[in-house]
Amino acid sequence: MKTSLISGERFYSLEESNLVKEIFKKAVKIFEAFGYDYINLSHFEPYEFQELTFGEGSKEAITFKDSYTKESFGLRLDFTTQVVRTISHLRNVKLPERVYYFGKVFSLDRRGFEKLQTGVELIGEKSILADFEVIQVLTEFLKSLGLKDLKVILSHAGIVRKVADEREELLRAFSERNLEALKEVLGNDIKFFVEVSKNPEVLNFLEKYDLEKEKEELLELGKLLEEFGIDYAYDLGEVRNFPYYTGVIFEIYELKSGKALAGGGRYDNLSKIYGKEYPATGGAVYLERLLDILPKNVEKKDYFVIDKTKKRLGLKLADVLREKGKKVGMEIVKERGLEHSLIYAFDKGFKEVLLVEDEIVKVYTTPKDYVVMKIREFLDLIE
């Protein structure tokens, strides 16, 4: 039989889906604590702008053509570009704009056509304090998920671009960490591009390449991170995949797993595509990687009600409990025996099962253990 799965598609289990929901709730709490507003974004982008933004990378876009207008458009490849496009078309923009998002990006990556992300963008401010804020927000968010052993890896888009002199083969060598190809060009200087160090002296060699501005920005950002207790190091050979970055770039690693869980940087020229001049910085969290390392559980719900009364007292009890803010499910499978109903309820994450018989309710805390009380007595115990 032919499979109904699409190559590159991912299904999420109920446990994974519950974790995604909990991650989103944490994201809302942390991002809004820093003054960020939620922005709901289109799934689509004009393909001509994807070509302008991503260059060769636009070939990874999943594209469509409107049979009526003949316009080509693609599913969004990236949230940053979609945020900038949206902000550039909004009226009454008050700079700086702080926004956060949550959803999927799409590409023809065979490892997965769709990837979940959340993140923040700070539009309209060019200071290093803005870059620091984005890193601080994302770090606090990851910590709120119980991830404590984090390290921020810093670099600057201008470094590799200047050293490679915009040569495509050298940019590719940096991206692929091709040490042989890099050594042919850099000689002994290659050691500065492969060393990961917190020591600010690693930045001194940048003056040799007339990169004093990049050096000062990285030094200033490092001091801010140090002051606020955020662990960091410099990796001057770091390259971000998207070509629109212009300034500080970063990745946030969880050291136990060795995974980069978030990344981003400054992109001061991106809004020019849409006729604006908004300096900006931002970063995204890669939720697929979070799903790999965070514990996944069935969502806990409060009560599962089994109604054995002719007057539907169980249904009425369930409504009363929901009005009190409880999460309540009902047994609707008439043919199922009590034992199987109890097993089902506890397997689905219900904390207690309520078997309602006339004015009496049996409160099960396990498939075997219960107490008996009147319905009114039970309700008096509920907060």
Swiss-Prot record:
Example of a GO MF term: histidine-tRNA ligase activity
Compartments where found: Cytoplasm
Location (main, coarse): cytoplasm
CDD domains from the UniProt entry: HisRS-like_core
One Gene Ontology biological process: histidyl-tRNA aminoacylation
UniProt keyword Amino-acid biosynthesis, yes or no: yes
The entry's keywords: Amino-acid biosynthesis, Cytoplasm, Histidine biosynthesis
SUPFAM superfamilies in the record: Class II aaRS and biotin synthetases
Domain of life: Bacteria
Any single GO CC term annotated in Swiss-Prot or TrEMBL for this entry: cytoplasm
Listed InterPro entries: aa-tRNA-synth_II/BPL/LPL, HisRS-like_core, HisRS/HisZ, HisZ
Pfam families assigned: tRNA-synt_His
Other facts noted in the record for this chain: This function is generally fulfilled by the C-terminal part of HisG, which is missing in some bacteria such as this one.
Role noted for this protein: Required for the first step of histidine biosynthesis. May allow the feedback regulation of ATP phosphoribosyltransferase activity by histidine.
Assembly description: Heteromultimer composed of HisG and HisZ subunits.
Protein name (Swiss-Prot/TrEMBL): ATP phosphoribosyltransferase regulatory subunit
Species per Swiss-Prot/TrEMBL record: Aquifex aeolicus (strain VF5)
Gene that encodes the chain: hisZ
